[in-house]
Amino acid sequence: MSAPVRRISARTGLDETSADGTFKRTDAAWRSTISREPGSTFPPEKDRYHLYVAHACPWAHRTLMARALKGLEDVISITVVMPIWQRTTPDNPNDEHTGWMFADHSSSGNNVVTNSAGLGGPFPSSYPSNEADPIFNARSVRNIYQKVGDKDGKYSVPILFDKKLQTIVSNESSEIIQMLNSQFDEYASCSEVDLEPEDLKEAMESVDSWIYPSLNNGVYRCGFATTQEAYDTAIDELTAAFDRAEDILSSQRYIAGDRFTLSDIRLFVTLLRFDEVYVVYFKTNTRSVANSPVLLNYCRDIYQMPGVAETVDMHQIKEHYFCSHPDLNKFSIIPRGPDFERMLQAPHNRGSFEVKRRRISQAAVSDEEKHSLKSDESVVSTL
């Protein structure tokens, strides 16, 4: 009897479910830091760093938003990968890995027309915003990792790449957005924007501690659960976190206080995809943003900030989710509604929190002035 053929499969999100049916996300492996400190291996420089991103991916979307809000478009270049996962080594029948691919606009290019199971579509073979890899001319994101010696990791985006040293700096989105916020001010066109102000750091850490596990990752814990018990635990936590965000945002403009921060980016990228994808695909239908006036207005407020709408491509978001996992959606049928991005273009009233805050501040100053006048009067009366 011949030995069984070992089928190679680099890891994807679908491979991160434990024996009890719980989705457990693998930690990012590349965690270096861009720093202005003397002797830093990765100092901030213009045109040195490159971001590999996907419009579909909420983790990558974080970096696109931070880059836009800080005005780093002319400082850090980007390449947007194709939305639908494909076989990364289609000529090797023993390697079943599927993942992010780069666009191939050549006439002979093997562009995306179906899902990795050969079903669904036909989908557009290319998009104007999706490009070939400008550094290695790689066909897949997997190839980028392999170029720097990562042969068996999880080949994810975003990737912050150092073109000078030809290596990956980081693939941890939460740390990349901190670097974009703090380390490139001398080059940023919006250097006055601080997305992690010192006086809000404690509040940010507090909200981030439940936004990530229960919402950002919570939707995946619901969608990739393989037992009812695992799903029930995840959906209970997600529902509670959704309500918690709604409660906080009913009394203040932003999730960590009176200013927009990185925590709002973290929350927004999940809420943006919630009704269009997660409610249906990941079975998070206990709540919806459209049915929450508070969260819908909050999303409108952020979407309408200069530069944010340009980071959103709902078409690619939906194509990725509904067409990249044949185990979840074999025929890659894409639901038509609910046109959430159109909802975000309507006016919002979140600015009323600023008016209220100014009135409270003015009232406080007025009270102090009254107290000061009374003190002066008492001094005069004693002379």
Model-derived features: positions:
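C-terminal alpha-helical interaction module
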Residues: 1-383
